[in-house]
């Protein structure tokens, strides 16, 4: 896995998500790729914030899109999906994951 491959995969996923859910989709990369200490077989951790209510069906749509990108680019993508309403709430701000992503996350 190299940086160019990672960037192409992330942009491809972002394009598919915007096509499906609209221009207000937000992506943040976190974990080893964001820190720059990833290895050849690391996964790409991506927070997906959507402008719609997130339920199981919506999550499945995101996971399916990510899976298609995984197959195309030969990478592993770990997605976490939240609605914009939840992600920008006090409840989300109390989560350790939120704090980690705020600290090291990179907007795409």
Question: Language-model features: where?
Answer:
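Catalytic core of pol beta-like nucleotidyltransferases
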Residues: 1-25, 35-40, 51-108
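P-loop (Walker A) phosphate-binding loop of NTP-binding proteins
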Residues: 32
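Short beta-strand->loop micro-motif that forms the acidic, two-metal-ion catalytic signature
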Residues: 45-49
């Amino acid at each position: 896995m190299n940086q160019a491959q990672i960037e192409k995969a992330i942009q491809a996923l972002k394009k598919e998500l915007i096509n499906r859910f609209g221009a207000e989709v937000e992506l943040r990369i976190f974990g080893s790729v964001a820190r720059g200490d990833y290895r050849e077989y690391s996964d790409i951790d991506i927070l997906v914030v959507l402008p719609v209510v997130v339920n199981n069906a919506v999550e499945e749509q995101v996971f399916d899109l990510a899976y298609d990108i995984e197959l195309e680019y030969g990478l592993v993508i770990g997605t976490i999906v939240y609605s914009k309403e939840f992600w920008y709430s006090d409840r989300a701000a109390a989560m350790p994951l939120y704090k980690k992503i705020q600290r090291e996350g990179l907007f795409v």
